């Protein structure tokens, strides 16, 4: 039988080759991968259809449905299921009349009936086998059948129908649809459209089927009316005037905060300071001849200087434009050539212009004004730098005008901005903005989205990307605050989320790419964020879910627009997870564009008859109608006529009757009502509720990673390569669904030079295959990349360049783009494996370079040829997200932690390897080397000798002789951390006898008010804050890493003379940083705090260390020996030298070094205590814990995995309130009078790790205990970025049982100081000093309350009912914890 069917199968395989399967736009993504959920409804046609015979009726219905499928899919070819179990392939070309289409459909139906019958499932299986596909091809998703045909949606195994039309009678048809894909509203609308279409063509069957209106009466109620008044004359005023009003009425209001990081201190600037500085800049520009409409170019970095420069330019009446120093000099020259600026401001922090740029300026521009090095000083003074032959700063002569307005009048049609977008001839286009748009929409946005002067906005957009304007202008319009991060805050994986939480950002503007940077490797929640506005690219449901997993209170607003529409955009709001947790579940994977903001319309216009709007579901071209459109392209009048079009839906002079009179000065700069549409070139559809979704481009312009790229611009540049004969660039999806730029190129085989770029292809690989081409032409491909790097921005260089003998053509002689797809991963792998051989010179790679190369190949979806160590990660297709993953992999494989900015700074294999070697310092590649573990010991000895004071006064008693009470002044660091705030509470909860305690709290903040608010927030989060604390807290601002904390001499002297007790609790806790990265924060800062005790009043010194300082084999053996001989563990008087060798983690090494140095200070007279806690866990009563805690992450990760590892051994887990009590008690202990004692914190009894994890099962979570090896393999194979353990994979998968082993500790001193404290103060003792099953239950309940764990099934025990207020829940995840058990591994 198979032999008989074979010819028919061959025929059918030909029929289905490269078939484009027709589909309709859906409303939902099915919840399950397999079945369908069938629903149906019947539709009645007008009575006249009842006289038509059923065969003709079937053809009419089929023709009408085929037309709608084409109009809704945007394709002119249809493939659908038809009667008698046949596949119908049909062309519905534009311009065809219905009567012609009916004839074509009749012929097509007869033709398919003439084909042999086929089993489509069998055909699919055969094609899968023949082409070695990973899936079963599908040939149809929709169909039209007759009444006799009982086909169901799930009729076939490999072809699940989405929609079937069944002709019931000549005047009635049934619509059977998958309700997992379509809403009843959409199906009802589709039925109305079919009826309307058939009715209209019945009356006029010679009409173009693409011109028949699909806007039904129901749709007209939700679609925009293109004839309404959009508030043409409602100018709100110029943005700089509104800013100036805020500055003059509320001068001291905080405007900009440049947040600090590391040794870079934070800077704050008021509205008055920025107003004064920008006035000086404006007066300078005017004095140098800058006039209204002149362009002033700003060479800038991210920061307050950019805002000052922008406002200065606007106040002068000029137009500002921004150049990013990251662009290649040749590209900068292109922008300068388009802008033709009359002025130039170079911001000092951006560096100097490249000589090639300076040469271009000298040869091509006539600048009236130039500020060579603008820099706003911390005290508000503004400097502009000095020009050649002048010794005076350019701005000094204008300082006296800082409070004087320029009074330059601008109007709604004056131009404030010049932004760049891609151009089709290789030259970018400059878009001139209008003042109208910069302010018109903010009042509505504030009301609609709840924005106010109390919000904190972020400055995260690319500095030369027009969304940066929204970052700056929104807060200054409202009188709000703008937060500016450091580049490392953006560049280091996970740190941007911490930055958001730390600084309490409430509103942010993001591109989807920046949103992914924000969430990638992030663990710190930031519940303060309430609005996130996304612009610039396609926003996915995954992007939203990831953001809301960290910011549960954020409502996400997807905004659709372009540089040309300025602020006139659409919006679609995704409510916050806290208000509607399941909202995202009902959305498709791409977030819709939504509907226009106030007085903005998205008009989806019929591409074949622009006098008609599209019906719901129909693909058309999107035009934006608004009064806030930009002016147009600078110097390109013909393109402006094509893109900015008078509204043809109203007659000329339609708005002449509006009364828009007035005598405001700005009316001199208004061109009157201009009802214009901007032709976006995007394709879109209306949804049933009137919202819009985007579905592609009408031309070859695309967006990738937030940047808009003209494919023609890329092709123009490639075509100029000497060995290129023919080329085309397309956007294709790789195997991971990521948009990828691919250029297909045919070389000039007639050029002899080509031979030098051709390599031999091994016999095992076919030369004509994709792998063969990549191998044969890899030298040519690399040369083309180098050619493009000099001409294009990095994001516009194609990820893949495929060299072909010829480009495929369709029958019309045009390039057949359907045959140019993303290469099969197996082909890329074969080429990559070949390039890994040493025959291509890879032996020249160092071992480290080869390891980096391997990591890149694992990450890059294109598996590129990396044959030189000078290859750039980003040229090969690397993105910011892939760079984030690379940082994680480097951390895992090479035990090196790099900021993401480092990967951008050193993008080649060679540069990155060199930087890794530099960061490692003296660490050798030889794994047997001990230098990495001896570095900290040698450094500790050196610091002790070089940095410690020669003598420290010994404190004998805190109580004067005979006194029953005395004031005591405690200096506490790390107060805003998890343990630190508990120490603060324990200090201030004590009665005033015998010690009346005042705490001098060290906090990093911009001012004392902000610092106290930080303290209050963290204490409130953990249920500790009392208003009575505030008068007893004195804030100390300063940097512990600087000598004398960088304080003025008097402030430092007052501390030295006033402080009685120092509790140094601050530390940088990091899972993988090497000692060198932690040295400043954990070692040198400790020395600086120690030296506070070197002069003035004698002081006690308590240092909060960690048992990580004892994590060596020596102490495990010492502990075992002590217990065997009847002791209790490592003695507290141990000399610490057992940790001078063998400590592996940088954190433990830094704590050991700090202890060593403190002991040396003790030998010089210092008195006090070293406190060594292990895992500091949450409060037993409330369960409130550090949300980023390693052990809590472990619980969450195990629940998600459904497995727990069976690990023996105990864990030294001690509740935070017990550790805090010990820190306080030890700081006042008489034992510290005679020596620098050690207080070990050891849980008695310790909980076993097995019992800790089994608590999940006890409380109802479905987990299975398995051997560690099995668990680790399951985690490694299933874990992704959503798993809480993802950032810690390198820890938990690397012999975790061994990592968890820790020595038992003697606690004689701990018992003594607690007993002494109780005797002295009669304070209520801490009862729970270790973690039991009940306490673990409170931690699990805490995770459940925060939403980190779902409701458990019924277990042996009910979850404890812990008390957490809504305020605590909102704050607890936002506070940054400086100490947690995350450090311990």
Swiss-Prot record:
Boundaries of every Carrier domain copy: 843-920
Pathway per the UniProt entry: Amino-acid biosynthesis; L-lysine biosynthesis via AAA pathway; L-lysine from L-alpha-aminoadipate (fungal route): step 1/3
Protein EC: 1.2.1.31, 1.2.1.95
InterPro entries: AA_adenyl_dom, ACP-like_sf, AMP-bd_C_sf, AMP-binding_CS, AMP-dep_synth/lig_dom, ANL_N_sf, Far_NAD-bd, Lys2
Reaction(s) the record says it catalyses: (S)-2-amino-6-oxohexanoate + NADP(+) + H2O = L-2-aminoadipate + NADPH + 2 H(+); (S)-2-amino-6-oxohexanoate + NAD(+) + H2O = L-2-aminoadipate + NADH + 2 H(+); (S)-2-amino-6-oxohexanoate + AMP + diphosphate + NADP(+) = L-2-aminoadipate + ATP + NADPH + H(+)
Keywords (A to Z) from UniProt: Amino-acid biosynthesis, Lysine biosynthesis, NADP, Oxidoreductase, Phosphopantetheine, Phosphoprotein
Any Pfam family matching the protein: AMP-binding
Cofactor: how bound: Binds 1 phosphopantetheine covalently.
One annotated GO molecular function: phosphopantetheine binding
Annotated positions of the O-(pantetheine 4'-phosphoryl)serine modification: 880
One annotated GO biological process: lysine biosynthetic process via aminoadipic acid
Function, in words: Catalyzes the activation of alpha-aminoadipate by ATP-dependent adenylation and the reduction of activated alpha-aminoadipate by NADPH. The activated alpha-aminoadipate is bound to the phosphopantheinyl group of the enzyme itself before it is reduced to (S)-2-amino-6-oxohexanoate.
Family: Belongs to the ATP-dependent AMP-binding enzyme family.
Designated name of the protein: L-2-aminoadipate reductase large subunit
Organism: Eremothecium gossypii (strain ATCC 10895 / CBS 109.51 / FGSC 9923 / NRRL Y-1056) (Yeast)
Organism lineage: Eukaryota, Fungi, Dikarya, Ascomycota, Saccharomycotina
Gene field: LYS2
């Amino acid at each position: 039988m198979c032999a008989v069917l074979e010819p028919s199968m061959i025929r059918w395989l030909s029929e289905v080759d490269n078939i484009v399967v027709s589909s309709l736009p859906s409303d939902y993504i099915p919840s399950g991968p397999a079945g369908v959920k069938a629903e149906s409804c019947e539709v009645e046609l007008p009575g006249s259809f009842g006289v038509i015979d059923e065969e003709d009726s079937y053809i009419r219905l089929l023709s009408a449905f085929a037309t709608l499928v084409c109009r809704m899919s945007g394709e002119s070819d249809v493939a659908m299921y038809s009667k008698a179990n046949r596949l119908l392939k049909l062309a519905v070309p534009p311009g065809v009349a219905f009567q012609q289409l009916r004839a074509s459909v009749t012929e097509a139906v007869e033709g398919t009936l003439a084909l042999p019958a086929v089993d489509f499932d069998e055909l699919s299986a055969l094609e899968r086998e023949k082409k070695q596909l990973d899936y079963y091809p599908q040939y149809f998703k929709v169909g039209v059948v007759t009444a006799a045909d009982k086909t169901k949606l799930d009729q076939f195994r490999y072809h699940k129908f989405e929609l079937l039309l069944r002709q019931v009678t000549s005047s009635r048809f049934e619509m059977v649809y998958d309700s997992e894909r379509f809403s009843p509203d959409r199906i009802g609308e589709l039925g109305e459209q079919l009826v309307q279409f058939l009715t209209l063509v019945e009356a006029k069957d010679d009409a173009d089927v693409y011109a028949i209106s699909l806007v039904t009466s129901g749709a007209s109620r939700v679609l925009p009316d293109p004839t309404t008044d959009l508030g043409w004359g409602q100018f709100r005023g110029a943005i700089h005037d509104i800013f100036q009003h805020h500055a003059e009425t509320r001068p001291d209001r905080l405007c900009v905060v440049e947040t600090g990081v590391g040794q870079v201190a934070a800077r704050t600037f008021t509205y008055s300071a920025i107003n004064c500085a920008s006035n000086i800049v404006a007066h300078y520009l005017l004095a140098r001849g800058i006039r209204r409409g002149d362009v002033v170019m700003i060479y800038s970095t991210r920061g307050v200087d950019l805002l000052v420069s922008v406002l200065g330019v606007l106040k002068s009446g000029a137009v500002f434009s921004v150049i990013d120093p990251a662009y290649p000099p040749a590209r900068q020259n292109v922008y300068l050539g388009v802008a033709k600026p009359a002025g130039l401001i170079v911001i000092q922090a951006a560096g100097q212009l490249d000589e090639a740029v300076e040469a271009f300026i000298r040869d091509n521009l006539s600048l009236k004004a130039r500020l060579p090095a603008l820099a706003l000083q911390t005290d508000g003074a503004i400097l502009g730098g000095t020009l050649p032959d002048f010794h005076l700063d350019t701005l000094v002569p204008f300082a006296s005008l800082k409070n004087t307005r320029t009074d330059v009048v601008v109007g709604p049609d004056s131009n404030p901005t010049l932004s760049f977008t891609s151009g089709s001839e290789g030259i970018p286009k400059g878009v001139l903005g209008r003042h109208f748009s910069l302010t018109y929409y903010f009042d509505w946005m504030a009301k609609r989205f709840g924005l106010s002067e109390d919000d904190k906005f972020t400055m995260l957009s690319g500095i030369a990307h027009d969304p940066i304007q929204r970052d700056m202008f929104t807060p200054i319009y409202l009188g709000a605050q703008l937060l500016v991060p450091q580049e490392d805050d953006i560049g280091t994986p996970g740190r941007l989320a911490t930055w958001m939480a730390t600084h309490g950002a409430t509103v942010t503007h993001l591109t989807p790419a920046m949103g992914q940077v924000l969430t990638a490797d992030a663990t710190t929640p930031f519940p303060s964020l309430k609005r996130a506005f996304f612009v610039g690219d396609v926003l996915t449901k995954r992007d939203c879910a990831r953001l809301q997993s960290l910011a549960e209170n954020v409502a996400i607003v997807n905004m659709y627009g372009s540089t040309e529409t300025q602020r006139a955009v659409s919006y679609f709001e995704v409510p916050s997870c806290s208000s509607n947790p399941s909202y995202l579940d009902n959305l498709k994977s791409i977030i819709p564009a939504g509907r226009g903001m106030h007085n903005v319309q998205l008009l989806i216009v019929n591409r074949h008859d622009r006098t008609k709007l599209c019906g719901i579901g129909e693909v058309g071209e999107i035009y934006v109608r608004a009064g806030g459109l930009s002016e147009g392209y600078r110097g390109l009048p013909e393109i402006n006529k094509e893109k900015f079009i008078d509204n043809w839906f109203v007659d000329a002079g339609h708005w002449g009757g509006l009364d828009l009179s007035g005598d405001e000065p700005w009316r001199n700069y208004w061109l009157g009502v201009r009802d214009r549409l901007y032709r976006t070139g995007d394709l879109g559809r209306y949804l049933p509720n009137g919202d819009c979704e985007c579905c592609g481009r009408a031309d070859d312009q695309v967006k990738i990673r937030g940047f808009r790229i003209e494919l023609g611009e890329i092709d123009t540049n490639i075509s100029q390569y000497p060995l290129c004969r023919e080329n085309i660039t397309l956007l294709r999806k790789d195997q991971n669904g990521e948009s990828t730029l691919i250029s297909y190129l045919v070389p000039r085989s007639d050029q002899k030079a080509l031979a030098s770029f051709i390599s031999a292809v091994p016999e095992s690989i076919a030369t004509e295959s994709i792998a063969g081409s990549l191998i044969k032409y890899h030298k040519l491909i690399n040369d083309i990349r180098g050619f493009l790097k000099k001409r294009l921005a990095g994001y516009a260089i194609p990820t893949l360049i495929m060299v072909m003998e010829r480009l495929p053509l369709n029958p019309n002689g045009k390039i057949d783009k359907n045959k140019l797809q993303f290469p099969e991963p197996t082909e890329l792998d074969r080429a990559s494996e070949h390039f890994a051989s040493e025959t291509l010179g890879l032996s020249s790679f160092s071992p480290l370079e080869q390891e980096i190369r391997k990591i890149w190949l694992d990450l890059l979806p294109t598996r590129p040829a990396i044959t030189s160590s000078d290859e750039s990660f980003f040229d090969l297709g690397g993105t910011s997200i892939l760079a984030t993953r690379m940082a994680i992999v480097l951390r895992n494989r090479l035990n090196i932690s790099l900021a993401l900015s480092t990967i951008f700074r050193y993008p080649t294999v060679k540069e990155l390897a060199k930087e890794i070697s530099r960061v490692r310092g003296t660490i050798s590649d030889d794994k047997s080397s001990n230098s990495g573990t001896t570095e900290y010991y040698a450094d500790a000895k050196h610091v002790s000798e070089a940095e410690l004071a020669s003598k420290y006064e010994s404190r004998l008693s805190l109580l004067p002789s005979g006194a029953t009470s005395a004031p005591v002044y405690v200096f506490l660091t790390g107060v805003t951390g998890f343990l630190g705030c508990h120490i603060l509470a324990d200090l201030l909860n004590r009665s005033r006898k015998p010690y009346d305690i005042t705490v001098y709290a060290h906090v990093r903040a911009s001012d004392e008010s902000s610092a106290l608010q930080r303290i209050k927030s963290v204490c409130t989060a953990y249920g500790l804050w009392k208003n009575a604390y505030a008068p007893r807290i004195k804030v100390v601002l300063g940097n512990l890493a600087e000598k004398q904390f960088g304080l003025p001499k008097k402030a430092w002297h007052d501390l030295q003379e006033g402080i009685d007790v120092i509790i140094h609790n601050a530390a940088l806790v990091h899972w993988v940083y090497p000692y060198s990265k932690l040295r400043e924060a954990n070692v040198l800062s400790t020395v600086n705090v120690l030296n506070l005790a070197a002069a003035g009043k004698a002081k006690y010194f308590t240092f909060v260390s960690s048992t990580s300082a004892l994590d060596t084999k020596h102490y495990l053996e010492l502990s075992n020996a002590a217990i065997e001989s009847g002791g209790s563990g490592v003695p507290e008087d141990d000399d610490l030298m057992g940790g001078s060798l063998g400590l592996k983690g940088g954190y433990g090494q830094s704590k050991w070094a700090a202890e060593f140095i403190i002991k040396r200070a003790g030998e010089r007279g210092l008195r006090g205590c070293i406190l060594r806690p292990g895992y500091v866990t949450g409060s037993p009563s409330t369960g409130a814990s550090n949300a980023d805690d390693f052990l809590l992450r472990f619980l969450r990760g195990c629940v998600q995995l459904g497995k727990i590892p069976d690990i023996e051994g105990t864990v030294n887990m001690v509740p935070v309130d017990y550790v805090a009590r010990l820190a306080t008690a030890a700081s006042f202990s008489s034992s510290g009078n005679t020596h620098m004692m050690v207080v070990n914190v050891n849980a008695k009894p310790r909980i076993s790790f097995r019992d800790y994890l089994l608590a999940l099962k006890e409380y109802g979570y479905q987990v299975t205990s398995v051997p560690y090896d099995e668990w680790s393999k399951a985690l490694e194979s299933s874990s992704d970025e959503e798993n809480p353990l993802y950032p810690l994979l390198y820890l938990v998968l690397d012999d975790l049982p061994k990592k968890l082993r820790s020595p038992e500790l003697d606690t004689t001193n701990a018992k003594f100081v607690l007993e002494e404290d109780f005797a002295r103060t009669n304070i209520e003792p801490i009862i729970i000093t270790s973690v039991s099953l009940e306490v673990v239950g409170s931690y699990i309940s805490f995770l459940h309350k925060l939403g980190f764990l779902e409701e458990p099934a019924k277990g042996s025990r009910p979850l404890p009912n812990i008390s957490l207020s809504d305020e605590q829940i909102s704050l607890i995840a936002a506070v940054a914890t400086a100490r947690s058990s995350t450090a311990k591994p």
